[in-house]
Amino acid sequence: MAEILLTSVINKSVEIAGNLLIQEGKRLYWLKEDIDWLQREMRHIRSYVDNAKAKEAGGDSRVKNLLKDIQELAGDVEDLLDDFLPKIQQSNKFNYCLKRSSFADEFAMEIEKIKRRVVDIDRIRKTYNIIDTDNNNDDCVLLDRRRLFLHADETEIIGLDDDFNMLQAKLLNQDLHYGVVSIVGMPGLGKTTLAKKLYRLIRDQFECSGLVYVSQQPRASEILLDIAKQIGLTEQKMKENLEDNLRSLLKIKRYVILLDDIWDVEIWDDLKLVLPECDSKVGSRMIITSRNSNVGRYIGGESSLHALQPLESEKSFELFTKKIFNFDDNNSWANASPDLVNIGRNIVGRCGGIPLAIVVTAGMLRARERTEHAWNRVLESMGHKVQDGCAKVLALSYNDLPIASRPCFLYFGLYPEDHEIRAFDLINMWIAEKFIVVNSGNRREAEDLAEDVLNDLVSRNLIQLAKRTYNGRISSCRIHDLLHSLCVDLAKESNFFHTAHDAFGDPGNVARLRRITFYSDNVMIEFFRSNPKLEKLRVLFCFAKDPSIFSHMAYFDFKLLHTLVVVMSQSFQAYVTIPSKFGNMTCLRYLRLEGNICGKLPNSIVKLTRLETIDIDRRSLIQPPSGVWESKHLRHLCYRDYGQACNSCFSISSFYPNIYSLHPNNLQTLMWIPDKFFEPRLLHRLINLRKLGILGVSNSTVKMLSIFSPVLKALEVLKLSFSSDPSEQIKLSSYPHIAKLHLNVNRTMALNSQSFPPNLIKLTLAYFSVDRYILAVLKTFPKLRKLKMFICKYNEEKMDLSGEANGYSFPQLEVLHIHSPNGLSEVTCTDDVSMPKLKKLLLTGFHCRISLSERLKKLSK
């Protein structure tokens, strides 16, 4: 893992050298020379780390100490850089020349110590004949495979067809005992893939449905809340008495629920008190997956069990072939030599029939040349015992990653098992960690480079795609529990991060912690009460119900912390006092608060001049101070709510940004900023803004957005919430890059073809008054794929989606979503040529009883 620390040091030294050059010019040129020397030496050391690791794996025990020395050196250099940069910046701010000189002298002395250690390491390296492999292209841009996964069948069940047919018949059998099907087997066999395919196929035959990930550390209250939301329990009833109201609703509904990855029977004992038995006359069904047959037997009886087995050799090779070649490639092995085919079969044999091992191996091989030599090297690395195949393959696939991608992959282990992780979060945390840097001459943004890395991880089958965005990009993802365990094990071994369970013990080890994640309230509280020394902590993740994390933080400075993520339970609201010591976290770059958290960010946050991302979840009421605008590095300011909650967050006049304090060049996201605290003329300065959401849009803002030449030329996503009818006509036709538009208007709003961007892909209309004239405009949009109408008022009871006189009617529309319509009783389409690509019609919300024409019935949920 030394290579990860070395990469971090290299990236940080590039940043510091650039800052010194800009800020100090020739005054501290010799410091820049030291930084450049650090960068060169760390690159050199990194170039032979892989060779050293190979020698260690080959049995050369002497190399182990060398790798440990390299890791400690890289860690100390990272500490030095993280400590040095804020001091220089602070002294520059107040023009403390003597203090700055003192810092520089101190830094130079530390560099001399490091130089002596580098000489010793290089001497030992030569003694052990460790060579420079020069195989660490950390700057590679992963574009070739960027879109390979986009059109893949996410429910591929090669080799499981018989299992699928048997389970489908069992689920639809009226005499199914207990109404439960239990899919059991060892990790990696495809239990979840098979269960989700079944669930999605049969759920339309039930009145309501729910899919829940249970995982190793479940919380019954959160599982029940998740089920309640999916089956349509009202928010009021969830707040009043979740358990009783959920049970009452399920008793009268025919439901199907998938509980994925149940580890033990204790959680079922809690859930069954609320979930009614499935063997009633109603005919409800329960699908569970578990690696433990006894769990399935306990829940559904012996007859419920369906044990998955490893794939037979031919089915294994069929899956391997499907993943190696493009999905539309009919030639397959036609152009391959017989020897390459045999090597491929041997590789598949080492995977032991485990689908996860097979697809991960195929993902790794897709990144290599399709030659006998390249594949033989993989085969030789897999060992000779079939039973070791899966573990070997997973570790080998990790080592096959580009060095710059390895810490990005390990980051998935910071989240709990089965957690759905937003791509936005991952990308911006990687950037905050300096895992992703933009080199000189590269015109692409860091976010684009990070997205390439995420695409590559999905393409290699190391990460599972969960959701896509409106334009086919990754919205969220998950990691398989076996790969999650690999992340945790590798991270612990290398001190990359620790989970709370292994953080206790030797105070010396605790003091070395660089990243820590808490999944449990009790463990978190016990840990902080032990008064640990956390001077080196960079990343803190807390997934908890107890809001005391904020009070515990008051006792620590966290001077090197640059990523803070607090995810609170949704089941209750927490009023917190965020300590003023937040202002001491001078290295903080990424802040995310999620859950029902009420409080105020302290004014001391203005000292956090390196903040890049502030992300406040839509359920949180967190007030930002006015000084948040002063961060020169701010890229994303997100408040994910456009209702009263967001208004409350900004109920301070001092939030109004000073046009001269704003640093607009880096800003890419401003989401749900109240118009009254945002001066429209600032829009001209936001030249790199990609996403904008404004609450309470004024006429002056509409006018500014509607001028002939677009003021926001890079804008891709625009969300506007109007509190009253705008007198100005909105015109967005001059914005070619806007692909996603959200308009929230409580009254009638005049719209025509000039009101919309020409390349719109997703459109949401909320609280609109919809008539046939607006509908006629929408039908002509040439690229619109998804249309959502949220609590709209319809002036006519019947909505006809058929083509107009010109023949147009949603030529590219794939999804139409109508939520809680007011005044609409019928949706029809009378011709066969309209909406030729429509795949799904969603009717959701209360009182959504709409009659549909025959064609639309087939597409509705």
Swiss-Prot record:
Residues 63-83 form a coiled coil. CDD domains: RX-CC_like. LRR repeats lie at residues 225-248, 305-327, 388-411, 449-472, 510-536, 585-608, 609-631, 652-680, 689-710, 712-735, 736-758, 784-810, 811-835. Changing S769T: ToMV-B7 viral mouvement protein-dependent induced cell death. Keywords: ATP-binding, Cell membrane, Coiled coil, Host-virus interaction, Hypersensitive response, Leucine-rich repeat, Membrane, Nucleotide-binding, Plant defense, Repeat. The record marks Y767 as: Contributes to the specific recognition of ToMV-B7 viral mouvement protein and subsequent resistance to ToMV-B7. GO terms for cellular component: plasma membrane. InterPro entries: AAA+_ATPase, Apaf_helical, Disease_R_plants, LRR_dom_sf, LRR_R13L4/SHOC2-like, NB-ARC, P-loop_NTPase, RX-like_CC. Signal peptide: none annotated. ATP binds at G185, M186, P187, G188, L189, G190, K191, T192. Changing Y767N: Impaired ToMV-B7 viral mouvement protein-dependent induced cell death. The keyword Methyltransferase does not apply. GO terms for molecular function: ADP binding; ATP binding; ATP hydrolysis activity. One of its GO terms (biological process) is defense response to virus. It is a peripheral membrane protein. (Microbial infection) Interacts with tobamoviruses mouvement protein (e.g. tobacco mosaic virus (TMV) MP, AC P03583) at the plasma membrane; this interaction triggers defense responses leading to programmed cell death. Binds to HSP90 proteins (e.g. HSP90-1 and Nicotiana benthamiana HSP90-1); this interaction seems required for defense responses toward tobamoviruses. This is ToMV resistance protein Tm-2(2). The lineage of its organism: Eukaryota, Viridiplantae, Streptophyta, Embryophyta, Tracheophyta.
